Amino acid sequence: VVTKIVGQKAYLLCLACETDFVAQNAEYTASANAMLEVAVKNDAADRDALMASKNDEGHTVEEMVTEKSGQTGEKIELAYYARIEAPYCAAYVHFNKKLGTILGFNKEIPAEVAHTVTMQATAMAPVSISEADCPAEVVEHERKIAVEAMKQDPKNANKPEAILEKI
């Protein structure tokens, strides 16, 4: 995973391979960064647009991926690409370079706070941005866990379940 922030836009690219041996190779990382630079230069809106975008030599990202696959002898693929736009953007890539997150904020926040929030989003793997976007079965599952936890609290021992569900 590689990321880049340019002004009010953040870009994230995940180039997948089969082994850690290839993934930890500096040349492989350089290739991922080169593809990310193509994304930034062309301001690619989505994965399909990025795959069709060309570098300065006239090669598409799709061709770059195929070439890298031939060089390494492994199946290489552009597993994920995202671009966001917000007044303030932050990015985090986990130390193993296998996980990363880009976030947009509607106002500027201290860099340390942005870093911490982005790191936590990466670690927690959220399923949605808000409860409204969350699948109903996930909300119900989490609600059941919360009610069970409240039942275990001695302070709630005498409260009816109907009341616990409203807390």
Feature locations, PLM:
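N-terminal assembly/interaction segments in proteins that build large macromolecular machines
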Residues: 1-167
